[in-house]
């Protein structure tokens, strides 16, 4: 009898109601209704001791003397790879380098106060065939490059600093006499470029002052960006096109616990541009695609979660485009926003067939200029001889559980000759806006529930 009483008491203490079934845990689902796999819940930190033999960079000629040590740093990466792998450890101090290229089995760890500082000399970043603005082309390499690697990590409490001021200044000086100057005319290195990789984790460090895009992930899968501080200034000198995170032909991406404040988009979903950029999923009879080599490598993006982040100034918290073709299952949730231009920005290119579908933005507080912006994006418009304008689509777009102060609530331009909007859901929105206009007729099948705009 005593044993029975003890068991019952234990069950009650543990919160299990005797005679009742335990409540089922709700599954975490993608916007299309499929289940999110457990991989997205595993946010365990990288352990330095688990990365293999440690190579302190100062023991191999990379010293804090203000000189550029690209050769020494690359030689160390090559040595570690030849020796079977390990981790480069950057101690406290500032260490200057140009572009370096990591190899299989070689990791990077930056201790608190340890900074890898990029050279401000363009010749320290070799030109190579790479991926920029939705095209395959020649461009500068990044400061940190990883291509074709499995299991690559960057971690620690230090910083990678792009030392971008000189590059920014040159860009704006050139713009002053040529207002059509582009990022390809005034090339600048990215900070981190991850391409053709899988099982990558970048965590804990500061990524700052990039000359161009800060973190570019291309043709990669299973990448986690955790607890990063990503920054470039919007004043007194604007850091042009310093997107925090560019996701370009990727699958299974987690961005969690990051702070982002940059002079462009915080998270931009890319993938390609041009009249046949969707050739990876659409057959074009009678079209010689070999005439468009810049579109080789275009692709879609699937299964992306951005959560538990804090945003300072940026152009877009989540931007689809401008070089984007197909995006499926994108979630932005549990974020705080201060001074963003746009919470959700759908850039619709009239020269590119685009499909944005199953996008959810939820559980958000903050302020910005536009709650949602949907509009044509005509920069570098080029049909490349195609006679008809390709149609684009945005479908199953959900925004819910949001409290937001903004200038414009519904900044949506209707262009049925270029794109079609369908199956939007606005639910549980508490909005304070200067411009409150709301055109549900712009969207086919628009569900509106508990939306308060004041």
Segments from the language model and where they lie:
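Extracellular "leader-to-stem" segments immediately downstream of a signal peptide or signal-anchor
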Residues: 2-5, 11-12, 17-89, 94-107, ...
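Short, T/G/N/S-enriched strand-turn elements that build extracellular solenoid repeat scaffolds
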Residues: 77-81, 96-105, 119, 204, ...
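Short glycine/acidic-rich loop motifs that flank beta-strands on beta-rich extracellular proteins
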Residues: 85, 98-99, 119-121, 163-167, ...
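Active-site-proximal loop/turn and secondary-structure-junction residues that shape catalytic pockets
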Residues: 94, 219-221, 271-273, 322-324, ...
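Right-handed parallel beta-helix
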Residues: 112-113, 150-159, 198-208, 221-234, ...
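Short beta-alpha connecting loops at secondary-structure transitions
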Residues: 136, 290-291, 316, 342-346, ...
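Glycine-centered low-complexity coil/loop motifs and glycine-rich tracts
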Residues: 210, 321-326, 347-355, 415
């Amino acid at each position: 009898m005593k044993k029975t009483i003890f068991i019952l008491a234990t069950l009650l203490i543990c919160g299990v109601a005797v005679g009742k079934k335990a409540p089922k845990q709700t599954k975490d689902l993608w916007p299309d209704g499929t289940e999110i796999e457990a991989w997205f819940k595993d946010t365990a930190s990288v352990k330095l001791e688990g990365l293999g033999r440690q190579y302190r960079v100062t023991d191999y000629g990379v010293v804090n003397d203000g000189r550029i040590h690209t050769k020494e740093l690359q030689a160390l990466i090559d040595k570690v790879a030849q020796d079977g792998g390990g981790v480069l450890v950057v101690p406290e101090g500032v260490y200057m380098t140009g572009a370096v290229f990591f190899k299989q089995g070689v990791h990077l760890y930056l201790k608190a106060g340890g900074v890898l500082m990029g050279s401000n000399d363009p010749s320290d970043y070799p030109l190579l065939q790479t991926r920029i603005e939705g095209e395959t082309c020649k461009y500068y390499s990044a400061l940190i490059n990883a291509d074709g690697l499995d299991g690559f990590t960057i971690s620690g409490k230090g910083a990678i600093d792009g030392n971008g001021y000189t590059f920014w200044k040159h860009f704006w000086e050139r713009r002053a006499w040529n207002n059509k100057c582009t990022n390809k005319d005034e090339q600048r290195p990215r900070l981190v470029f991850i391409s053709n990789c899988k099982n990558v984790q970048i965590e804990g460090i500061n990524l700052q002052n990039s000359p161009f895009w800060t973190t570019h992930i291309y043709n990669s899968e299973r990448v986690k960006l955790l607890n990063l501080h990503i920054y470039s200034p919007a004043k007194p000198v604007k850091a042009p096109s310093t997107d925090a995170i560019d996701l370009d032909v990727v699958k299974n991406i987690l961005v969690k616990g990051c702070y982002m404040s940059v002079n462009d988009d915080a998270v931009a979903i890319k993938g390609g541009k041009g009249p046949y950029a969707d050739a990876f999923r659409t057959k074009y009879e009678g079209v010689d695609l070999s005439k468009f080599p810049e579109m080789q490598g275009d692709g879609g993006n699937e299964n992306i979660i951005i959560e538990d982040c804090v945003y300072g100034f940026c152009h877009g918290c989540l931007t689809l485009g401008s070089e984007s073709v197909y995006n499926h299952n994108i979630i932005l949730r549990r974020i705080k926003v201060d001074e963003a231009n746009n919470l959700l920005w759908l850039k619709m290119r009239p020269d590119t067939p685009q499909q944005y579908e199953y996008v959810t933005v939820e559980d958000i507080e903050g302020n910005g200029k536009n709650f949602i912006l949907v509009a044509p994006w005509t920069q570098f418009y080029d049909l490349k001889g195609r006679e008809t304008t390709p149609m684009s689509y945005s479908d199953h777009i959900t925004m819910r559980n949001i409290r937001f102060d903004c200038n414009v609530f519904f900044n949506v331009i209707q262009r049925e000759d270029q794109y079609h909007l369908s199956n939007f859901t606005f639910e549980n929105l508490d909005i304070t806006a200067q411009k409150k206009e709301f055109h549900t007729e712009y969207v086919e099948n628009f569900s509106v529930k508990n939306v308060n705009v004041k």
